[in-house]
């Protein structure tokens, strides 16, 4: 037998769920890297976890290391030997090389060739060694390499970790790993484990991976998080069927309850129906954030949408036959939480949105208060309302009044007691408060939707009205934060401006709104007039970089369109998609190289051209038939009115044949300078015309 199964358990105090989940996916990769570092070839690597243990299971862990050769290259023989003759023996330089390696016998030294020079050489062979001596150093290096964000020290230990470590149990090939002092973390190892807390506090001896798994299974520890998740989902499904309810499975919450339980049990509790007078988001958020409960819904018929039910799902880690006692305890805690929520909500309803003291809250240092931000957004909203008035289906005067009102009260809920308790309800609470205070429904809904989209695939504002309110918020945040240097760099983006920018582009694209990233940004910056001066091209470039996330496409096609003067967001997307359709068309697939060869040559001829240079040309200076043929084909395109971008692109790429003939027969760099200049100007005109769609030299096929 050359290998065996290796199991390592790190027993810890309860790990914080979110930190554990964030780092868990990296653990197998980090472990694999440590094995590679030591040239250990292993089988599959699995990492399991519960709140109080990490378990590393490695199949086919070798019993012995591989035999390795370590090579050392010294100085050139010419300068390391006496009289430049290696037969005369080594001089001080040569002797020094071997002495550094701890070698005394230099009589039969070796040489080798490196970089075409003969140099002193020595090879050290490392024989196979038992791998058992490497296991603990690997485990300790693994622990030190984990990144949980925060760590702590306890007692007089040398190293820190996210929570105190109580034991490292190593099970491998019957070897003895007991009583190894781990001074870094302040304990001696035991080949033992602990089970579920309710099963006992003592260590239980184990002597093999098989015995380890059996002990945990018999004592209410489900080691594999996938199995714990499956158990939770199965028990939820059974409760749904039994009680005719619908449980909303929040995936983040599901992962969290898997991470905080060793033996999960799913229980159904209920709360007083009187609490259902609260907005449903308050109840579901309170249950999730404070108690880690799943929300329950009921549905009277298939035609009706599910409504919040006065029930909740709790995932318990307790081992108890008295389930009702556990449920009763959770119901009592939830009642207190929801009673607090009622108090906050009713207090908020007493305060008019108009009276929110926005001037008392600083937006960002150097950018004024929330009131200042609201006033800047109002100016932006007025500009956008006038620009998009035809899409609002209401008189301009009415639109200006309602959107102005929406922006004025949009930030009021940030000062509410409910949002102070649950920040994720910002905007949502503004919607409910606005309805209760008899605001226009469009105004109220725009408050709810002002922060949308919340993520890449999340819903967008449901109307152009809401879109204008959302765009005003996003544009002001970009202008103001860029103006004080809060620009994302590398992985740092504390104000989530990349997500915000993506949302801005997605809203504009979804509603087909005209927005020029050069002209409109400049107009808005000047109209608001109070931002600190900064180079708007930096913001323009930042927004252009987001197109790679916005469009699922070959990046070079996106780059080709962005390399033109086109800065209208919708037109950029239309051109990219049209080029993609053309290049994806099966009829063009086989001739892409042919299509692009002439256009690439056209681009190369013009690559150093000054765009401001005069580009006039005269047909009278054309000498070759191919010049006239290309001009006629090009002129036919220039004077045509195309039904679509697709037909225009088709026509432009149709120039490849006359272009090929042109380059075969016409010498652009003619000896006659006037003819040469005329030809270059003509080709520049053809190239410039294609820039109406994209920069062909950027497209990679």
Swiss-Prot record:
Family recorded in the similarity comment: Belongs to the class-II aminoacyl-tRNA synthetase family.
Entry superkingdom: Bacteria
Reactions this protein catalyses: tRNA(Gly) + glycine + ATP = glycyl-tRNA(Gly) + AMP + diphosphate
Alphabetical list of InterPro entries matching this protein: Gly-tRNA-synth_bsu, Gly-tRNA-synth_heterodimer
Subunit structure: Tetramer of two alpha and two beta subunits.
Biological process, per Gene Ontology: glycyl-tRNA aminoacylation
A GO MF term: ATP binding
Keywords, in A-Z order: Aminoacyl-tRNA synthetase, ATP-binding, Cytoplasm, Ligase, Nucleotide-binding, Protein biosynthesis
Pfam families per UniProt: tRNA_synt_2f (PF02092)
EC main group: ligase
UniProt-annotated location(s): Cytoplasm
GO annotation, cellular component aspect: cytosol
EC number: 6.1.1.14
Keyword Protein biosynthesis: yes
Record-given protein name: Glycine--tRNA ligase beta subunit
Keyword flag Metal-binding: no
């Amino acid at each position: 037998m050359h290998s065996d199964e290796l199991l390592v358990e790190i027993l810890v105090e309860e790990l914080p769920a979110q930190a554990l989940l964030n780092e868990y996916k990296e653990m197998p990769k980090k472990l694999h890297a440590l094995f590679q570092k030591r040239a250990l070839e292993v089988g599959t690597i699995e990492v399991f976890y519960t709140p109080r243990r990490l378990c590393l299971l490695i199949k086919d862990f070798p019993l012995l290391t591989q035999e390795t050769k370590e090579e050392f290259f010294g100085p050139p023989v010419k300068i390391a030997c006496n009289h430049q003759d290696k037969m005369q023996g080594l001089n001080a330089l040569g002797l020094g090389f071997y002495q550094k390696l701890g070698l005394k016998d230099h009589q039969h030294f070796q040489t080798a060739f490196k970089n075409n020079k003969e140099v002193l050489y020595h090879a050290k062979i490392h024989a196979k060694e038992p791998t058992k001596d490497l296991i603990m150093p690997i485990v300790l290096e693994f622990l030190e390499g984990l990144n949980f964000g925060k760590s702590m020290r306890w007692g007089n230990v040398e190293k820190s970790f996210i929570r105190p470590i109580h034991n490292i149990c190593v099970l491998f090939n019957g070897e003895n790993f007991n009583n190894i002092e781990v001074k870094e973390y302040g304990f001696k190892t035991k080949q033992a484990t602990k089970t579920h807390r309710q099963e006992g506090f003592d260590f239980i001896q184990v002597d093999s991976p098989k015995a380890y798994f059996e002990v945990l299974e018999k004592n209410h520890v489900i080691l594999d998080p996938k199995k714990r998740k499956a158990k939770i989902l199965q028990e939820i499904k059974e409760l749904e069927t039994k009680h005719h309810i619908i449980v909303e499975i929040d995936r983040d919450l599901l992962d969290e309850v898997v991470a905080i339980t060793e033996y999960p049990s799913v229980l159904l509790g209920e709360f007083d129906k009187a609490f259902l007078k609260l907005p449903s988001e308050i109840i579901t958020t309170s249950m999730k954030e404070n108690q880690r409960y799943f929300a329950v819904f009921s549905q009277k018929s298939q035609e009706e949408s599910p409504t919040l039910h006065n029930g909740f799902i709790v995932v318990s880690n307790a081992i108890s036959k008295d389930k009702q006692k556990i449920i009763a305890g959770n119901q009592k805690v939830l009642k207190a939480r929801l009673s607090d929520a009622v108090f906050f909500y009713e207090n908020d309803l007493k305060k008019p949105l108009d009276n929110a003291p926005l001037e008392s809250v600083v937006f960002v240092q150097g950018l004024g208060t929330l009131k200042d931000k609201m006033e800047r957004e109002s100016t932006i909203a007025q500009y956008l309302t006038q620009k998009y008035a035809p899409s609002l289906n209401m008189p301009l005067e009415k639109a200006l009044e309602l959107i102005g009102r929406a922006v004025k009260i949009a930030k009021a809920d940030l000062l509410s007691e409910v949002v102070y308790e649950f920040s994720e309800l910002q905007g949502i609470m503004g919607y409910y408060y606005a309805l209760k205070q008899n605001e226009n429904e469009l105004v109220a809904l725009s408050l709810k939707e002002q922060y949308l989209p919340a993520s890449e695939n999340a819903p967008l504002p449901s109307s152009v009205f809401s879109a204008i309110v959302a765009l005003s918020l996003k544009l002001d945040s970009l202008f103001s934060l860029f103006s004080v240097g809060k620009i994302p760099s590398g992985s740092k983006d504390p104000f989530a401006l990349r997500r915000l920018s993506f949302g801005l582009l997605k809203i504009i694209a979804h509603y087909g709104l005209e927005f020029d990233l050069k002209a409109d940004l400049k107009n808005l910056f000047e109209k608001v007039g109070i931002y600190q001066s900064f180079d708007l091209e930096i913001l323009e470039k930042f927004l252009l970089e987001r197109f790679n996330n916005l469009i699922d496409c070959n990046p070079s096609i996106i780059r080709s369109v962005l390399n033109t003067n086109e800065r209208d967001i919708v037109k950029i997307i239309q051109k990219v998609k049209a080029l993609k359709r053309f290049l994806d068309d099966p009829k063009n697939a086989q001739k892409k190289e042919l299509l692009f060869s002439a256009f690439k040559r056209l681009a190369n001829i013009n690559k150093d051209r000054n765009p401001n240079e005069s580009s006039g040309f005269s047909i009278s200076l054309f000498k070759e038939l191919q010049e006239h043929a290309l001009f006629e084909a090009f002129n036919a395109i220039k004077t045509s009115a195309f039904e679509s971008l697709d037909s225009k692109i088709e026509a432009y790429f149709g120039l490849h044949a006359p272009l090929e003939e042109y380059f075969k027969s016409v010498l652009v760099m003619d000896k006659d300078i006037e003819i040469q200049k005329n030809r270059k100007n003509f080709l520049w005109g053809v190239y410039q015309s294609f820039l109406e769609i994209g920069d062909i030299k950027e497209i990679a096929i």
